UniProtKB/Swiss-Prot annotation:
One of its GO terms (molecular function) is rRNA binding. Keywords: Ribonucleoprotein, Ribosomal protein, RNA-binding, rRNA-binding. One of its GO terms (cellular component) is ribosome. Residues 62-73 have a biased composition (Basic residues). It comes from Corynebacterium glutamicum (strain ATCC 13032 / DSM 20300 / JCM 1318 / BCRC 11384 / CCUG 27702 / LMG 3730 / NBRC 12168 / NCIMB 10025 / NRRL B-2784 / 534). Belongs to the universal ribosomal protein uL4 family. This is Large ribosomal subunit protein uL4. GO terms for biological process: translation. The gene is rplD. It comes from the Bacteria. Part of the 50S ribosomal subunit.
Length: 218
């Protein structure tokens, strides 16, 4: 594993130094099975699970036998709310449930690092000093800068929570998804073609990852 160096791009098209991507985060082995499991768990946890159908015992009415048991020539029936009747209850229908799956933190972290490593190896991670120059939000400037960084349509923009200027500038751009450094996750990394970090957000993410690694060792 080797550390990767990336140039820091500025909004006016210049290069403002470089940053080093630590190998323990951005040069890990990628397990497709692990990525699949973690993404499935993440999507499952996002499901509301509030779906509910009524059984024959919950549908209003149907307490009286519709006709006598014998002598009519018809098949015997006990309730007009039986599942085979129109307007009857649903048999084996969905009920409210929790779809979330228990996924160990180490697996979640390994999947995220694997996804970032895949993007880094394919030159799909970019680092910028700022998204737009100055203190005034500009969607036009943000769009031009991102298009200069990559020609791909789907971009994940990772900025600090305090960078309101960047958030407002890119909020309405189609194909651009904005996250804070502590919100970074496997699904959004894999869903996006390129990942654009602000320098501040990148340092925040690396520091959080390093701190978590030290806690595990202790």
């Amino acid at each position: 594993m080797t550390n990767l160096k990336l140039d820091v791009q500025t909004a006016d098209g210049n290069i403002n130094g470089s940053v080093e991507l630590p190998a323990e985060i951005f040069d890990r082995e990628v397990s497709v099975a692990l990525l699949h499991q973690v993404v499935n768990a993440q999507l499952a946890a996002a499901r509301q699970g509030t779906h509910s159908t009524k059984t024959r015992g919950e549908v209003r009415g149907g307490g009286r036998k519709p006709f006598r048991q014998k002598g009519t020539g018809r098949a015997r029936q006990g309730s007009i709310r039986a599942p085979h009747f129109t307007g009857g209850g649903i048999s084996h229908g969905p009920k409210p449930r929790d779809y979330s799956q228990r996924t160990p933190k180490k697996m979640i972290k390994a999947a995220l690092y694997g996804a970032l490593s895949d993007r880094a190896r394919n030159a799909r991670i970019h680092v910028v000093s700022e998204l737009v120059p100055g203190q005034t939000p500009s969607t036009k400037s943000a769009k031009a800068f991102i298009e200069r960084l990559t020609e791909r349509k789907s971009v994940l923009l990772v900025v600090s929570r305090e960078d309101i200027n960047a958030q407002k500038s890119a909020n309405n751009l189609p194909g651009v998804h904005i996250l804070a450094a502590d919100q970074l996750n496997t699904y959004d990394v894999l869903k996006s073609d390129d990942v654009v970090f602000s320098v501040e957000a990148l340092h925040t993410f690396i520091n959080r990852a390093s701190g978590a690694a030290q806690e595990e060792q202790n």
